[in-house]
Curated annotation (Swiss-Prot):
Catalysis performed (reactions): (6S)-5,6,7,8-tetrahydrofolyl-(gamma-L-Glu)(n) + (n-1) H2O = (6S)-5,6,7,8-tetrahydrofolate + (n-1) L-glutamate
Cleaved signal peptide residues: 1-22
Name of the protein: Gamma-glutamyl hydrolase 2
Recorded phenotype for the gene knockout or disruption: No visible phenotype under normal growth conditions.
């Protein structure tokens, strides 16, 4: 009896194999299609108005990035490797801008880059604040002179630019948004063209408003009312998104300059793909897409910069001249950081 059961199964298997073989037989070699394989492929000419070798400058922040666990040197500064990876994943290289090196050297390095990231952190006064202010003013000057030069101001970076533009260091209020993921609420009728969100797929834009796809980690924020109530701020930026903290207070979460390629984030676009120290960081496929689109937008803006510095100077100052330190074993904070304790002036 069992032989009769197996016969149909064998026949079915042979039938499937014959279908697969028939499909395989329809695959043609280039010589069978009439395609001239001796002809060289036609590649589109590069756009002369774009820079296909962009470099992003990232400003270092005071301290070792690990609360002194890695270095207690008084002159130490650091850059979390996630910011470097953000720029690199968009197709750029990185030059560290060491905040406490001689200003002459720092601003010569600024001439080697096509965009800047101002990172998260805690320093809101002293030399760091003054350097951020000077970099910001130089970036505006370069844009006013006709060079397209973007800034990504993330978390603390956004807070500092807000203080500088508003000329009010007390404009932020306490918020409860530490170590938590959130959605983003788009301002009604906001035009996202020219913003980080312009190339997001419609489905991802929709999910941003309903799912927790971005990481928040800050104790301060600015309400839309305070933001719009400051003439300097409302003239410079438009509010793109808001968020709600753990106590129900609404704060500004994404802004875009109406005149310059300057984007401000209260949230962290770099963490989803590149930080693992907190279980709250979203790592879903949608969350990773958010990080990738943020990287792509920054570098696409940097490609519009026609600054073409001497190659040797760029190579001598790239982040590749430094080694990151792994600190993820602590289970908190950053996974990797670049620590700078000596000025490296190789211009």
């Amino acid at each position: 009896m069992w032989s009769y059961v197996w016969l149909p199964l064998v026949a079915l298997s042979l039938f499937k194999d014959s279908i697969i073989m028939a499909k395989a037989a329809t695959i043609l070699l280039p010589s069978q299609t009439g395609f001239d394989i001796s002809r060289s492929p036609v590649c589109s000419a590069p756009d002369p108005n774009l820079n296909y070798r962009p470099v992003i400058g990232i400003l270092s922040h005071p301290g070792d990035g690990a609360s002194g666990r890695l270095s207690n040197a008084t002159d130490a500064s650091s850059i979390a490797a996630s910011y470097v990876k953000l720029a690199e994943s968009g197709g750029a290289r990185v030059i560290p801008l060491i905040f406490n090196e001689p200003e002459e050297i720092l601003f010569q390095k600024l001439e080697l880059v096509n965009g800047v990231i101002l990172t998260g952190g805690w320093a809101k006064e002293g030399l760091y604040f003054e350097i951020v202010k000077k970099i910001f003013n130089k970036v505006l000057e370069r844009n006013d002179a006709g060079e397209h030069f973007p800034i990504y101001a993330i978390c603390l970076g956004f807070e500092l630019l807000t203080m500088i533009i508003s000329q009010n260091r007390d404009i932020f209020e306490k918020m409860d948004a530490r170590n938590s993921a959130s959605s983003l609420q788009f301002v009604e009728n906001v035009n996202i063209q020219g913003t980080i969100f312009q190339r997001f797929p419609p489905e991802l834009l929709k999910k941003l408003g309903t799912d927790c796809l971005v990481m928040q980690n800050h104790r301060f924020g600015i309400s839309p009312q305070s933001f719009e109530g400051n003439i300097a701020l409302s003239n410079f930026f438009k509010i793109v998104t808001t968020c709600v903290d753990d106590n129900g207070k609404v704060y500004v979460s994404t802004v875009q300059s109406t005149k310059y390629p300057v984007t401000g984030f209260q949230w962290h676009p770099e963490k989803n793909a590149f930080e693992w120290g907190s279980s709250k960081i979203p790592h879903s496929e949608d969350a990773i897409q958010v990080t990738q689109h943020a990287a792509n937008h920054l570098v696409s803006e940097a490609r519009k910069s026609l600054n073409r510095p001497e190659s040797k100077k760029v190579l001598s100052n790239l982040i590749y001249n430094y080694k990151p330190t792994y600190c993820g074993y602590a289970g908190i904070g950053y996974d990797e950081v670049y620590i700078f304790t000596q000025q490296r002036s190789l211009l």
